[in-house]
């Protein structure tokens, strides 16, 4: 009897120890997962929210009014630091501006050209074939003007970042006061959506910072949406044409498929069921 009671007592103690071990292991796993999540957030930035962009989807096109407003935001806010090297004024024709409006925009810029007949360089008004000029002559000048930080070219920025549209939109609206205990280095700003949490670019969008030509209220969110749409177009200016061509091909191939099914199932059915009998005469 004593031996049996002892064995039962030892079994209960072993079961309790096993339960405590599982609890401790679960707690350690939770702490490890949380640590990994915090480290990932610090390295890659806060998880991005997902927004429904008007041009997402196989049969949806860009909002061209938003592209025009976005170009206005870029020209008045972003162009002070960021270039757009892969876009020419002619690319804006039929997308955001008429040809006359695009020419007027180009002529506002003085472009260095030449040499002329005497071998000298000269300045002339911009033309539709000219690219949109950048704010700095070279990378060194850009870094000198921005305390060592190099503002990236925005031509392909939505393709150069994971989930680019949501990233740009969240980044522009993500500036906030740092959490307690977080020290922001000099010349930097806290933005949890930027990898590392600190970014050299200050908050640029404020309500009413741009006066839209079409009278749309220039709220901070509206400006962020419009400039993000403009940058999406800058990265894929051919997207509307590509989707239209894809829709045409889908329609054409659907007709071919229907025709092929018709001929296989009905037009040629008598040929498939025909039997040839050879009666050999001996």
Label every PLM stretch briefly.
Residues 15-22, 235-253:
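Juxtamembrane/start-of-transmembrane alpha-helix segments at the extracytoplasmic/lumenal side
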Residues 83-164, 186-214:
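Gly/Gly-Pro-rich "capping" loops immediately C-terminal to redox-active cysteine motifs
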Residues 33-34, 38-53:
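Acidic, low-complexity proline/glycine-rich segments
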Residues 74-85, 227, 231:
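The canonical Cys-X-X-Cys-His
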Residues 1-40:
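N-terminal mitochondrial targeting presequence
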